[in-house]
Structure formats: C-alpha cells, structure tokens
Amino acid sequence: LVSSFSFSQETDYEGFMNFSYNNDSGKIILEINKLDSEFMYINSLSRGVGNNDLGLDRGQLGNSRIVYFTRRGNKILLIQPNLRYVSNSSNYLENKAVKEAFARSVLFGFDIIEKTKDSYKIDITSFLIRDAHGVSQRLRYSNSGSYTLNKSMSAIDLDRTKAFPKNIEFDVLLTFTGNPSGNLVRSVTPTASNLTVNQHHSFVELPDNNYKKRKFDPRSGSNPFIVYDYSTPIDDKLEQRFIVRHRLNKKYPKQEISEPVEPIVYYIDNGTPEPVKSALIEGGNWWNQAFESAGYKDAFRIEVLPEDADPMDVR
C-alpha cells in the first residue's frame, strides 16, 4: 500500500514492514516494530550487464540470508545468525553453549533516528546503495576491469520499490566507474567506463514452523543442506544432511493419490514469446508424472503469470 502527498513530502509504504521515501533527501526510512524476529533477506539484479560471459544477468539471485534486527545501545544492527552449527537439545544450556561458540555476522549497523513506544526508525539508504551483489568483484575476477561504486551516480529507483503484506522490495540504480579491460564490458555498455545496473533487495516474512525436515538420500540426485548438530548422540555423525525440497502435503492424507494442500506453481514471464512459451509449459508439466508416482495429483504446475499479478508479491 502506497500513499503520496506531494513532491516535497514523503511517500509512505505499508506492508510487511512500513517505510517511507523522502522526495527531497532521496532517503528510505524503515520502521522496525519487531526486534529479534527473523526474516529472509535476498539481493538480486533487476537490470543486468547483458554479457553472459560476465554472469551479471537480469534476474540473477545473490545471497539468501536469514537475518534479524536487534538493538545495541543507540544502534540497530542487522545480524545473520549462524545456522550451520546448531544444537537441538532439550537442554537450554547446551544449546546456548553451541550458539555462543560460533561467530555470527553483523551485516550492517544503523543509527536510531526516531524512537516510539513500539518501534524504531532507521535510515537504510546506505545499506541499499552499496555493492551487495558483488558486481565490482565479479568484474575484477573476470579480468574485465577495475570498477568502484560511484554513489553520486546512484539512487533509489521507485519503479520497483514496493510494499506487500508478506514482503517489502527496494530497487536501486547503481553506477560503477572505472577502467574496462577486454571487450566483455565494452561490447554491451554505451560508455564502458560508466557501467549502470539495478540491484534489488527483498525482505520476506518467514513461513510457519510446520515444515518437516527430511534426511538427504544420495539417490535423489539433489544437493544436500548440511548442518553440524552438536546434540546428536556420541555414536552418530555430527554432520547432518537434509534434502532441499518443496513443501508439499496431501489434502487427503489417507488417499493413495490426492491433490496437494497447496500445489507447486512455477510462473513463466508473460513476455516470453511463442513458441518458447508453449514449449516451457509442455516440458515443465511432464514433471507431474513423477509427482503422481509419489501419490500427488496436479501437484506441479507451469503457468503464465497473470497480467494483473505483481511478480514481486511473494503471495
């Protein structure tokens, strides 16, 4: 939900977290009313460089992190907990000892600019306008030149800055200036010394805790998610492997074949041309055969994104 008053005032966004954009200063002010509450933070590129050999393409996802805001003195810190080393013991002190034995990562620190009874306001502009995706590093590693972020040529991009009930989205225009090397950047950039992309930040609400982990089976052909559980019995492996999978439950658990409570749906960009669009739908729907063998009916769908749907809304 967005409300705007005038050019000289603020544009307010109401959603998973409320924030405002000041038209005069160009700053984003975020309101935090749930400290120490975990959510997902994802960065990506909403506009890329255009050369596949660079690997900086439109829509490329960066890191996905579980994070939370916490207060320390006059600061709000964005912290990424260590989820690789855990203890699932019924003993609180054992869990606490393992938690304190391994490092966390503070991703950013913010000064508190306003405090109310139930919330804090912080300026997150500097957090957004930074090279979170590692563009300059990728350019350097690919021997394409030495670039640094030029903040005077970077700004918040409101076209893709939105708020929804379960997620908030921020988009920024970033310009990197430097000296290109080779032809990879020159071939796709009007002025190779000034390379401009758009970087996206997503804050997403986590689902409920009803998801059930499943041990990894190497026959699945998938990659495992690995954690080290210090509460495992002494004769068991410290390393625990779990399969990365969709959350899928039968609507009628007692039936041999049942529709799912919620199907898995992959959406195709409605700008995809034919015959590519039809081929993607037909090919993707073949997966339903595998799900039917596992006892599910119409559990996997490939659909064209509806014209009135916003792809940034996680719902």
Segments the model singles out, each with a brief description of its role:
Residues 37, 271-299:
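Zn2+-dependent metallopeptidase catalytic core
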Residues 1-9:
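Bacterial Sec-dependent N-terminal signal peptides
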